[in-house]
A protein has these predicted regions:
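N-terminal Sec-pathway targeting helices
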Residues: 1-16
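All-alpha RGS (Regulator of G-protein Signaling) helical domain and cognate RGS-like helical scaffolds
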Residues: 15-16, 20-187
Length: 187
C-alpha cells in the first residue's frame, strides 16, 4: 500500500508541476517574449528558392506585426499606440499582398504562409505599452536581421529594393519605439 501511495504522490506532484508551468506560460507574457530568436533568421545559401524563403519569412513577419497591433488596438490607452496599431493594420495587408503576388508569379506558389506565434501582451495594466514596445522592438530587430541576410545573398532587384525599404522603415521606427520606451518607462 505504501508503494502505491508513494507512486501516486510522485505522479500528483509531476502533474501539479506541469499544470503550474502551463498556467504560468499562458498568463505571464514574459514567458513568450523570446520568440524572436535571432539565430534562426538565416535564409541559408543563395539558391533558386532563396527569394521564396525571404518572401515567406517576410509575409510571416508582416502578419506578426498585425497580430501584435490587433492585440494592442483593443487594450492600449495611449493615443500614440492606438495610432501606431491603426497604421500597422492599414499598411501591412498591402505589403503582404505584394509578397504573395511575387510568390505566385515567380514560383507558382499559392500556399498561404502560417501565422507566426507572437508574444502574449496580457491584459491592460500600467506596463501594457511597455510589453507592446518590447515586442515590437524584438520584432523589428528580427526583421533587420532578415533584411541584412537577404541583401548579401539575393540578386533580384525587387527583393533588394524591398529589403532596403523594409530596413529603412524598421530602423526609423525602432528608434521611435526606443525613444518612447525611454520617455514613458525610463528604460
Amino acid at each position: 500500500m505504501s508503494k502505491i501511495s508513494t507512486t501516486l504522490a510522485i505522479s500528483l506532484m509531476i502533474i501539479t508541476g506541469v499544470i503550474g508551468l502551463t498556467i504560468g506560460y499562458i498568463t505571464n507574457p514574459q514567458y513568450k517574449i523570446n520568440m524572436y530568436d535571432k539565430t534562426s533568421m538565416d535564409f541559408g545559401r543563395a539558391d533558386r528558392t532563396l527569394d521564396l524563403r525571404y518572401i515567406n519569412a517576410m509575409i510571416a513577419h508582416h502578419r506578426g506585426a498585425m497580430l501584435l497591433a490587433t492585440a494592442a488596438s483593443t487594450q492600449t490607452q495611449r493615443p500614440e499606440m492606438k495610432d501606431l496599431s491603426a497604421m500597422i493594420l492599414k499598411n501591412e495587408p498591402g505589403a503582404i499582398a505584394e509578397l504573395y503576388q511575387w510568390k505566385k508569379d515567380w514560383y507558382g506558389d499559392t500556399k498561404e504562409v502560417k501565422d507566426p506565434i507572437v508574444p502574449n501582451l496580457g491584459s491592460y495594466d500600467e506596463k501594457f505599452d511597455l510589453r507592446f514596445l518590447n515586442a515590437l522592438i524584438a520584432h523589428h530587430e528580427a526583421g533587420l536581421v532578415m533584411t541584412k541576410d537577404i541583401t548579401t545573398k539575393s540578386s533580384r532587384t525587387e527583393i533588394l529594393n524591398n529589403a532596403d525599404a523594409v530596413d529603412t522603415f524598421l530602423n526609423t521606427t525602432l528608434k521611435l519605439f526606443k525613444d518612447w520606451r525611454l520617455e514613458w518607462y525610463k528604460i
